């Protein structure tokens, strides 16, 4: 996987909602942004540059703009020179404020993109932070099929040829939705959430042995696909092995987990052999996961009932005598 990153040019080109207007520094549009954090350089503009986060996007709001306007020409030039001694990826003025002339001159000289936007500072920071969080999120690739089953993002894994795509195709025919086939791109958007998606090239397509490449959106309609989905369940399809059949889960009391990018996801292993209806088992697993999220564990409830029954039977069989 390539190292997550985004260029200034990509932000300018793909996100019209930011209302960015390039003032100068177009030669630096190829600068890469590698931090999702935003910096408001208020303290640095007073001359204190210790711990200056120059690797972040620099946002100058009303406060910074008003402070720079209050400085004498000599002091403004001094602060500007110190500020532009650092390598900066880009600078953005909010509220439609016009950048000070020394800032424009230095940005042009250093090749640092300088923007302004009509959006208020707080709103702008919220918007661009969401963009950076998505673009710079830790990510990995997994071989499998990601499908939404009863609202649960279900990642089907298993060795090649075990029947992942065929199972997913049957689920799609039943009304569930495809997210990604073959290679699933997984991003961690927070400490506990994983989002799965597909590359632009493979999106909405599946490979079925004997049929080739299928466009699921064209075959089953727009309601049969979606671009991304929260991963809430991993189901590993594994060929049935008689010698290890006793190792398969029989009660479901304990929930197995698999870790991806530091996030633990519920994990189920389903043995595959002729005669087993795997799609309906996957549907049932997804519905059961929804129940678990709601705090209802059928296996534990049954275990509690069984323990109560055994205790009552023991008392009836061996009554306590005075």
Swiss-Prot record:
Membrane: is it a keyword of this entry? no
Cofactor(s) required, per the database record: Mg(2+)
Q: Which amino acids does the record list as binding ATP?
A: 158-165
Instruction: List this protein's GO terms for biological process.
Output: regulation of carbohydrate metabolic process
Q: What class of enzyme is it?
A: transferase
Pfam families, A to Z: Hpr_kinase_C, Hpr_kinase_N
What InterPro entries is this protein classified in? HPr(Ser)_kin/Pase (IPR003755), Hpr_kin/Pase_C (IPR011104), Hpr_kin/Pase_Hpr_N (IPR011126), P-loop_NTPase (IPR027417), Ser_kin/Pase_Hpr-like_N_sf (IPR028979)
Q: What is the name of the protein in this document?
A: HPr kinase/phosphorylase
Which species is listed as the source?
Leptospira biflexa serovar Patoc (strain Patoc 1 / ATCC 23582 / Paris)
Q: What is the lineage of its organism?
A: Bacteria, Pseudomonadati, Spirochaetota, Spirochaetia, Leptospirales
Q: Which gene encodes it?
A: hprK
